[in-house]
Design a protein with these regions (language model features):
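A glycine/threonine-rich phosphate-anchoring loop and its flanking beta-alpha core
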Residues: 1-70
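Alpha-helix initiation and N-capping motif
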Residues: 42, 46, 60-64, 79, ...
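Short glycine- and Lys/Arg-enriched binding-loop motifs that mark or flank ligand-binding interfaces
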Residues: 3-4, 13, 18, 44, ...
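C-terminal charged capping/lid subdomain of soluble metabolic enzymes
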Residues: 50, 151-227
Length: 227
């Protein structure tokens, strides 16, 4: 409801990576019914929350704070709270896509946490983790990487960990190999001239795009998120 429903990206996975084959096709209308969420198992609700948390990181500190303050109500499917975060997430996604439909630059920020997440999904053959669970680990990894890149302090890492734990999202990946993850990351669809463009956190609510992340920093993060 809050992510792929808006934006027009249509893609399929390949054995070499996630969403590597695709196109753009804008729908005429997107219908969202919060009542549908009542039909989902808890694991899927948790997975969807990962994408909402992402929007707080990349675009809206107030959304991030609201999620932290209302985690219990959201997990209990309080419709008033859900309506706020779902609508705000869609507004953010639409605003970004409106400015950069084909991902020439700005739209890449929507991939915050997804470089690592896609690698985890690929390494585990898309069977061990839901997309949202992998994104949860990826968000934590992206904030760690931002910290090691000296962009955010250790308190931001702590706040990130606490929020992800409130929504019962995993912070570490099982059945993954660091070297394999590093290889998959290098094939990321955002890579240009062999350099991966990382989405890094400048502060909660603001991110930057950088290809100046060192191999040592990446491997340090991967070692920290793999168990």
């Amino acid at each position: 409801q809050v992510d792929s429903s808006v934006g027009g990206k249509v893609a399929i996975n390949h054995e070499l990576g996630k969403n590597l084959i695709g196109s753009f096709y804008q729908p005429k209308k997107v219908l969202i019914d919060l009542k549908c969420l009542e039909t989902l198992p808890k694991r899927e609700i948790i997975s969807g929350m990962a994408e909402i948390i992402k929007y707080g990181f990349i675009y809206d500190q107030d959304l991030f704070s609201y999620l932290s303050a209302n985690s219990q109500q959201l997990m209990a499917l309080n419709f008033e709270c859900l309506a706020k975060v779902v609508s705000r997430s869609c507004e953010i996604k639409a605003d970004v896509v409106r400015q950069d439909e084909k991902e020439a630059n700005l739209r890449a920020i929507l991939n915050f946490g997804h470089t690592i997440a896609h690698a985890i999904e690929s390494n585990t053959k898309y069977k061990l983790y839901t997309h949202g669970e992998a994104v949860g680990i990826g968000l934590y990894g992206a904030v760690l990487l931002s910290h090691y890149h000296e962009m955010v302090d250790v308190n931001t890492v702590r706040v990130t960990k606490e929020l992800l734990e409130k929504f019962e999202l995993p912070l570490q990946a099982k059945q993954c190999n660091v070297d394999t993850l590093f290889e998959i990351v290098g094939r990321d669809k955002k890579a240009v001239n062999g350099k991966v463009k990382w989405i890094l956190l400048a502060e909660i609510g603001k991110v930057i795009i950088s290809d100046q992340v060192s191999t040592e920093q990446i491997k340090k993060v991967l070692h920290e998120i793999v168990v």
